[in-house]
């Protein structure tokens, strides 16, 4: 058990950075909220196609979104399931947030054609940085567990073909985006990452 604790990433919605961001409401200005179009007056159903550590999904759910998380790696899915149940038991406030989160195990490329949502978010394993020390420990552990995401182009294509109004891809700020059937409608840039936003054209 001790070895697992040293080698597996921590998934925690109660303490750590996620808990702090929730308690202090520091996430209200997060670029992800702007990228998805989520606001206090606009509730959305969001599919997180690459759930990972669940941090983005929790942020969205804490701001009122209904979130479906898809994770294909069994070990990460199990970590997420345990963390969700721990948060549910922590307090009524957290239980209400977790109640808006549904965790699915599977390949998003297969599941997306069967689902409907307002927004699909994609945050794959990004290309390794040349300065690996800049990568936080939890992300290094996650990469060790899940490996790279060479099929991100296929996932983006599946998302763009799915029944949703908007697709949001989180990607390194200066890296070339995966090939796609169309260009992003717009981008929201941060210090090290950007959000490529694909808005489905309105039917005429």
From Swiss-Prot:
Its main location: cytoplasm. Keywords: Cytoplasm, Methyltransferase, rRNA processing, S-adenosyl-L-methionine, Transferase. GO terms for molecular function: rRNA (guanine-N2-)-methyltransferase activity. S-adenosyl-L-methionine binds at residues 55-56, 71-72, 123. Its EC number is 2.1.1.242. One of its GO terms (cellular component) is cytoplasm. InterPro entries: 16SrRNA_methylTrfase_J (IPR007536), SAM-dependent_MTases_sf (IPR029063). It catalyses: guanosine(1516) in 16S rRNA + S-adenosyl-L-methionine = N(2)-methylguanosine(1516) in 16S rRNA + S-adenosyl-L-homocysteine + H(+). It is found in: Cytoplasm. HAMAP family: 16SrRNA_methyltr_J (MF_01523). Belongs to the methyltransferase superfamily. RsmJ family. Specifically methylates the guanosine in position 1516 of 16S rRNA. This is Ribosomal RNA small subunit methyltransferase J. It comes from Rhodopseudomonas palustris (strain TIE-1). The gene is rsmJ.
């Amino acid at each position: 058990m001790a070895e697992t604790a040293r080698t597996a990433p921590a998934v925690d919605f109660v303490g750590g950075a996620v808990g702090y961001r929730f308690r202090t409401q520091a996430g209200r200005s997060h670029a992800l909220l702007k990228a998805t179009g989520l606001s206090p007056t606009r509730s959305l159903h969001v599919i997180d196609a690459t759930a990972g550590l669940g941090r983005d999904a929790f942020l969205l759910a804490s701001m009122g979104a209904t979130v479906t998380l898809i994770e294909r790696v069994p070990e990460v899915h199990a970590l997420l399931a345990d963390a969700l149940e721990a948060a549910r038991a922590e307090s009524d406030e957290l239980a209400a947030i977790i109640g808006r989160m549904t965790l699915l195990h599977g390949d998003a490329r297969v599941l997306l054609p069967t689902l409907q949502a307002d927004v699909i978010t994609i945050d794959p394993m990004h290309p390794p940085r040349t300065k690996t020390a800049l990568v936080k420990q939890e992300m290094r552990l996650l990469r060790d567990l899940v490996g790279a995401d060479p099929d991100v182009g296929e996932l983006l294509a599946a998302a763009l073909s799915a029944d949703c109004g908007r697709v949001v891809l989180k990607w390194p700020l200066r890296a070339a985006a995966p090939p796609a059937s169309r260009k992003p409608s717009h981008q929201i840039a941060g210090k090290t990452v950007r959000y490529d936003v694909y808005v489905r054209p309105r039917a005429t």
